[in-house]
Amino acid sequence: MTPGELRRLYLIIRVFLSYGLDELIPRIRLTWPLRFGRYLLFWIPNRHKDKSLGERLRLALQELGPVWIKFGQMLSTRRDLFPPAIADQLALLQDRVASFDGALARQYIETALGGALETWFDDFEPIALASASIAQVHTARLKENGQEIVIKVIRPDILPIIKADIRLMYRLANWVPMLLPDGRRLRPREVVREYEKTLIDELNLLREAANAIQLRRNFENSSTLYVPEIYSDYCRENVLVMERVYGIPVSDIEALEAQNTNMRLLAERGVQVFFTQVFRDSFFHADMHPGNIFVSYEHPEDPFYIGIDYGIVGSLNKDDKRYLAENFIAFFNRDYRKVAELHVDSGWVPSDTNVEDFEFAIRTVCEPIFEKPLAEISFGHVLLNLFNTARRFNMAVQPQLVLLQKTLLYVEGLGRQLYPQLDLWKTAKPFLEEWLHSQVGLPAVIRALKEKVPYWAEKLPELPELVYDSLQQHKHLQVSIEKLSGHLRGQQIKQRQSQYLLGVGATLFLCGSLFLLSGLANIPWLFIGAGTVSWLFGWCRLCKI
């Protein structure tokens, strides 16, 4: 480790010990060096004994800074790693940090765009509207048309900090399999790698701009979700310019109720937006926490959402979508055999998995869920239970499914916060069944034909020539095969002749040797000579084949 990494590691250890997180060290023989190290650092007491372990972990991550805050947020979705009480506390982590100087933000924007700010913008506000660990936002107006906008700027020098902490996380991840009995199954390096990819993606605002443009296109003229316009002419890797929007934070229940918002419709539309993104578009906003979702002031009786911050998105391929939809329907029909078979068929678990054992494990974990009324069953926790059970059967980490699970938990939590009686299954089931129906049977065949018609119409004039070329190739192939077959037959004949000559030569040589041993004078040498000539001739023929 470098001196800088050692200093950072000591700071992390000191913060963890001051929150009593040495309790997380398992009391097994392999961890005695860590427990002994705790005794050596006796001057760092636990100053938060009155708080629960989960709360202490959350506070420690907040003290370590933005990189660790985001890491904790990601870990909150991996409930196979922690007990529910700890995972719930990690989900409360807030990514809020002090803003950096507005003059520095102006300088960064001007450097990125290659000119004075006033060339493109008016009324630039140097005080940040919002600030997070990766970037902060300033308000302004477009000079060309007076449109209100926000300018998002990546924090200066954030990349070296992220890379340094990620390197340290990888080193710590290498220790986990050695210190925890179940450490290898948890795949700590994959967890860190997934987090690293998420962070690096968030640092590229051109990627976020492209994501927002795609989502805006998907929900053009939608009555459920509004995506602000992106002004791509002014976007760079570290600067993003988008339309400024106004709305009520979705978590501000009092404000929503004060304007008589239709809460039931709003909650149901949140579910519809999520499933539309996942199954219709295969492209979903994967960071739908309350800070990124607003509700329009307009038409409270017919409310719609406004989404921001598209740095993290997810996508599912066609097979994943089908297996996921069938999994949900099979689960709510309590067909655990079908759930187990779908996991194997999809490749989510190894093909040699014992389906009977897997079915029993799913039944054991999931059957108690149905003791509750259907309206109280958590979709997100259903998915979570399924994945946690599957991981015991060596289910590989599926980043797209982890993102989906996290997003579903957000959507469901928001929906029930808005309207506690929300029956998510009742809202989602018609959508899933309709989508599955569209993927199989006559509608799917007709759609596939429609998609292929332009291609075949383009290729139709070429069809006679293609058929002729194919027949000619077939004819030439037949001639080549016949020539090759004849050549192979000739080679086989030569090989048999050579083997025969080798055998004859060896026999004559052996006979001559025996005659020589019996005391005969000239005859043995005749046999030996003939055998040697025959053997050499056969060998030469064999070498030429």
UniProtKB/Swiss-Prot annotation:
Example GO biological process: regulation of ubiquinone biosynthetic process
One Pfam family in the UniProt entry: ABC1
Gene symbol of the encoding locus: ubiB
Primary location recorded for the protein, binned into one broad class: membrane
Family: Belongs to the ABC1 family. UbiB subfamily.
Principal EC category: transferase
Top-level division of the source organism's lineage: Bacteria
InterPro entries according to UniProt: ABC1_dom (IPR004147), Kinase-like_dom_sf (IPR011009), UbiB (IPR010232), UbiB_bact (IPR045308), UbiB_kinase (IPR050154)
The protein, known as: Probable protein kinase UbiB
One annotated GO molecular function: ATP binding
Keywords: ATP-binding, Cell inner membrane, Cell membrane, Kinase, Membrane, Nucleotide-binding, Transferase, Transmembrane, Transmembrane helix, Ubiquinone biosynthesis
Biochemical pathway: Cofactor biosynthesis; ubiquinone biosynthesis [regulation]
